Structure formats: C-alpha cells, structure tokens
C-alpha cells in the first residue's frame, strides 16, 4: 500500500520510497538517497512555512504549523540557554584571567562582545607551560615627523597571537619581523629599518595641551614586566616609534608640569606678598580712624540708648488707663462692643 502511495525512490529509481522531503516533496527509500538528493539539488530538507496552502488542505497543515511554532520556541529557548551557558563558561575563564593579571599588577578591561578586538583576542592561560600567552596589537608609526602622533595609525596596525609572558619584547618583535610576512610588510610600510633604533611605548594618559602621553618600556624586559602598572583594553597595544621621533613621555610631561607649577607658585607668592602689604596698610588706616572717632561715637550711642529708653516708657504709660487697667485694643465694630461688655478686653 505504501508502495502505491509513495511510489519509487526519486534518487535511485530502484527501491520503493518510504520517506518524503518536507521541502520539495521528493520521495526516498533511505538516508543515503536523501543525502544524495540534498547534494545534487541543494535542497535544505526543511519545510517552508511561507508556502501557499489551498483552503481544502488547510486542516491537514495545522499540525505542521503547530510543529513549526513549537520548533521556533524551542530554538529561541535553546539559543538563550546555550548562549547563557557559553557566556558563563567564557566569562568564568576571563574572570580568572583578569584576577591573575591584576595580581601581576596589570589592570585589564575587557571589551563588549561586538568589539573587533574582542573577536580577535586569543589571550589565554596555557596549562602545559603554565604561562599566559598574549595577543598583542602592534601600532607602527611612520618615521616622518609631520604625522600627528594622536592618530591611531590604523593602516600600520596588526594583531599577533601566542606570545608567552616570559619572553622579552625585543625578541618577540624580531621573531615576528623575520617569520611573519604581514608584520614585515607593515614594518617596511612604516619606514622602520633598523630594529635597534626603535622605541616601544604604551599609552599612559591624554593631556589637553600635549595630546597622548606615552610610557616608555624597555624592550629587553619580559612582556609581563613591560605591561606591569599599565592599563590594557582587551589586548595590549604597543606603539613602535623610531628613535628620532619626538614623543611626549611621562618623564618629559612631569618635568614641564613641575616647571609650570614652580612658575605659578612664584607668581602666586608675589601676589600674596603684595596683598599682605596692602591689607596691613588698610588695617593701620582703619585703626587710626577708630581712635580718632571713638569719643564721639560713645556719646552718640549713649544718647541714642537714652532716647530709646524714654520712648519705651512713654509707650507703656499710654497703654495703661488712669485706674491702672490696660488700654483696650481696637476690635472690629461687629464683635468689639460685645466682648467689651463682657469685660474680656
């Protein structure tokens, strides 16, 4: 009966078909024929929910619609739960990495998942060597002094991976130039010829007057010691300049700021001395005026007090009647006569 209803397999044309493709309604006898059909026709094998269904066959497709909606709900739940679990596992590893780096004196902040550095970052802890292997972003600045140092120089930026934290920075860079063709092309593009004439920097902070202030690192030190007491956003960014390029470093910035503070303190001391002298002169003038005007002021104040005293006594006499009772206050005409008759006022 099934053979008459489904017919012969559409792929092998030999056996009776047992299955039907939900997408294109083709018949198959086994899984191999189904896979061969998908390979030849590029069929996905999934039902198209937007396919037109006649009204006469609408009742028969209710189960398919229900299964489709249930499948969508399961897919959403699986995506939410699966991504949550993966993010928990990934976040747990990243949190452990962050704690170990903070113990080593490296302040790291991870980027959001949509960030490009986050997708390219492969920094991890290697269990075999018991070392952290870094992904490093190299920013190679051109040797021309006309270029603004505040630019990111994105055309000469490359990210490399799997650099042990115990390896010296100079050795890492030399190995990359020799073995990595992309790094070699970026170095030649930046007009950096001799590796010995280079200086390695990390951004420290930004000044309003001088732009970015860089922290100079020693290339002979290990990578972990170079990154100690520095801020890392997802991956460490190491800026490479030639020795002739003038860069605002922390030492030069502190020297200039100390000179400015000395100048400002000297000017402020001069101003304060002049203010003190002027204030002393004013105090002397005020004291002389007080001494000159003190007798007359005492006479005036005593006369004023006596006049106020006599005025208060006159007011009290006016408030009392001849029989010693206090004077009645003026009340509104409607209620005043009544209360006065009662003797309350």
UniProtKB/Swiss-Prot annotation:
This chain's function reads: Required for box C/D snoRNAs accumulation involved in snoRNA processing, snoRNA transport to the nucleolus and ribosome biogenesis.
Location relative to the cell: Nucleus
One Gene Ontology MF term? zinc ion binding
Give the matching InterPro entries.
BCD1 (IPR051639), Znf_HIT (IPR007529)
The domain of life for this entry's organism is: Eukaryota
Coarse class of the primary localization is nucleus
Q: Where is the composition biased (Acidic residues)?
A: 273-284
An example GO biological process term is: snoRNA localization
Know the name of this protein? Answer: Putative box C/D snoRNA protein SPCC613.07
Keywords on this record? Metal-binding, Nucleus, Phosphoprotein, Zinc, Zinc-finger
- Species of origin reads Schizosaccharomyces pombe (strain 972 / ATCC 24843) (Fission yeast)
Q: PROSITE patterns per the record? A: ZF_HIT (PS51083)
């Amino acid at each position: 009966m099934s053979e008459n209803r489904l017919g012969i397999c559409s792929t092998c044309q030999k056996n009776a078909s047992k299955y039907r493709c939900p997408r294109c309604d083709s018949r198959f006898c086994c899984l191999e024929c189904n896979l061969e059909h998908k390979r030849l026709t590029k069929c996905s094998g999934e039902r198209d929910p937007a396919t037109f269904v006649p009204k006469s066959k609408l009742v028969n497709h209710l189960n398919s619609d229900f299964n489709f909606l249930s499948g969508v709900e399961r897919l959403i739940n699986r995506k939410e739960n699966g991504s949550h679990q993966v993010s928990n596992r990934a976040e747990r590893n990243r949190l452990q990495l962050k704690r170990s780096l903070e113990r080593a004196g490296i302040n790291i902040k991870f980027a959001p998942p949509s960030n490009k550095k986050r997708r390219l970052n492969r920094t991890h802890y290697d269990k075999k060597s018991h070392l952290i292997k870094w992904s490093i972003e190299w920013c190679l600045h051109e040797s021309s002094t006309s270029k603004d140092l505040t630019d990111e120089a994105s055309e000469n930026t490359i990210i490399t991976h799997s650099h042990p934290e115990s390896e010296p920075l100079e050795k890492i860079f030399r190995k990359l130039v020799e073995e990595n063709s992309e790094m070699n092309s970026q170095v030649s593009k930046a007009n950096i010829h001799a590796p010995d004439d280079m200086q390695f920097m990390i951004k420290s902070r930004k000044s309003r007057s001088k732009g970015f202030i860089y922290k100079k690192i020693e290339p002979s030190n290990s990578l972990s010691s170079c990154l100690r007491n520095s801020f890392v956003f997802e991956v460490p960014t190491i800026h490479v300049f030639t020795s002739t390029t003038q860069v605002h470093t922390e030492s030069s910035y502190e020297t200039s700021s100390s000179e400015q503070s000395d100048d400002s303190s000297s000017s402020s001391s001069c101003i304060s001395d002049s203010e003190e002298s002027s204030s002393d002169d004013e105090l002397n003038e005020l004291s002389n005026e007080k001494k000159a005007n003190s007798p007359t002021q005492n006479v005036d104040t005593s006369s004023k007090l006596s006049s106020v005293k006599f005025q208060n006594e006159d007011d009290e006499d006016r408030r009392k009647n001849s029989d010693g009772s206090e004077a009645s206050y003026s009340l509104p005409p409607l209620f005043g006569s009544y209360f006065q008759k009662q003797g309350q006022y």
